[in-house]
A protein has these predicted regions:
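Acidic, proline/glycine-enriched N-terminal capping motif
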Residues: 1-130, 267-275, 279-294
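Phosphate/anion-contacting hairpin/loop surfaces
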Residues: 63, 69-184, 189-192, 196, ...
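Residue-level marker of intrinsically disordered, low-complexity segments enriched
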Residues: 5, 68, 117, 134, ...
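Basic, nucleic-acid-binding surfaces and adjacent catalytic neighborhoods in DNA/RNA-processing proteins
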Residues: 22-40, 53, 58, 79, ...
Length: 294
């Protein structure tokens, strides 16, 4: 799922490509993509895009008459820009919608059969706020705001960082990277942090997100993002199970749950203790190793 750094870079690219341009036509190519009825979606045809902004992990195009088009990429949704006569390069069945502009077409695609990605058209700031889960902006939050959000509930750090009602835009991938940078266990409870650990987490959150925004900007080179993925070779732990930690060389570990996995370095983050993986620990029972050197 595209997270805060990915969405920031998407918004910067969209600003360069479509702000100030007239939307000639919006084509809905999937019956599942539109999740709103009123205002009618064709009311933005012929209107000029006034701006692009972010609401959590959502991308918002602003139009006259207080209209906001909200694009939620979810896990497999992506945006692709193509100039006239330029080939799209993917199968037509993956296209959810297309936005035709004088200088090119913006394609909204989803490489999944679950059809979670969506478009909504709402009118007014109040309706737009209703789509905002309300988490604090991690790059803008003060120490006090960050602390209040983190300790509102006594959750694990992994759960708290990825809760959109607490923190805006952080998901599975960057939470792994943040916790590795902070040298904190993903299962440590939020209200158990010492002052020093809290400061490490606050600094690591801001630094990690800024580093990745800069890296993604360099990849785009002023163009449009084409390879938006949660798994990148430069990442320290996310998606790197059994590969060496770039800090200590120990193999990266994982916890598998639902449709996700949490990656961490046992030596850097849990003092060598292996965190229980539900599926494997149930299978191995007493043979499940407790520490990295077992």
């Amino acid at each position: 799922m595209p997270e805060l750094p990915d969405v920031v870079v998407y918004i910067e690219a969209l600003t360069r490509h479509i702000v100030g341009q007239r939307l000639e036509r919006l084509n809905l190519l999937s019956p599942f993509v539109l999740r709103s009825v009123d205002p009618p979606i064709d009311s933005i045809n012929g209107q000029v895009v006034g701006g692009v902004r972010r609401v959590g992990k959502r991308i918002v195009l602003t139009f006259d008459a207080d209209l906001f088009l909200v694009i939620h990429l979810m896990i497999a949704g992506r945006l692709r820009w193509r100039e006239p006569k330029q080939k799209l390069g993917i199968g037509p069945k993956l296209i959810l919608a297309s936005f035709e502009f004088p200088t090119g077409t913006l394609f909204f695609t989803e490489a999944s059969s679950k059809k979670r990605a969506s478009i909504q058209l709402v009118r007014g700031e109040e309706a737009l706020r209703g789509l905002d889960p309300g988490g604090v902006e991690p790059l803008d939050a003060s120490l006090e705001q960050f602390h209040e959000a983190l300790t509102r509930e006594n959750h694990t750090l992994k759960r708290a960082l990825t809760d959109p009602h607490l923190f805006s835009g952080i998901g599975n991938a960057y939470s792994d990277e943040i916790l590795h940078a902070a040298k904190l266990s993903p299962l440590k409870l939020t209200r158990s942090l010492s002052d020093e650990e809290f400061l490490r987490l606050y600094d690591a959150t801001r630094a990690t997100l800024r580093i990745w925004i800069d890296l993604l900007r360099k990849d785009v080179k002023g163009g449009f993002p084409e390879k938006v993925t949660a798994f990148r070779g430069e990442m320290a732990v996310h998606g790197r199970f059994k590969q060496p930690c770039p800090v200590c060389g120990s193999p990266v570990q994982r916890i598998v749950y639902a449709e996700n996995e949490c990656n961490y370095c046992a030596k850097c983050q849990t003092s060598g203790r292996l965190l229980a993986d539900r599926s494997l620990s149930r299978l191995l029972k007493d043979d499940w190793p407790k520490r990295l050197d077992d």
